[in-house]
Amino acid sequence: MSINSELSEITQLLHQDNYSCVVRNGVETQAFSRQGVQDLLSLYEERPEFLYNAMVADKVVGKGAAALMILGKVAGIYAAVISKPALDLLTEHNMYVKYD
């Protein structure tokens, strides 16, 4: 499955079920509802291997979330809203990013 089609699937989940963040790695998908970077930080601390090469769809990506995605070595990111500093940081690290 291509990065675009996988991101499209989890983006649909993000909006359809009103999650704040959806992460997919292979066949496993985890969806979160807390605001801010709490869920992403917990995932990075508890299961960093899950973020490796994962796809992430997030409602709001700021610089902190962007840094966690870089550290986790995610493969692709969709952001409904992204800050300029976050986009600059992700671009600097050659991360694949789609946003509205």
What are these regions (language model features)?
Residues 81-86:
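Short, polar loop motifs at secondary-structure junctions
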Residues 2-80:
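Conserved mixed alpha/beta catalytic, RNA-binding, or beta-rich assembly cores of soluble enzyme
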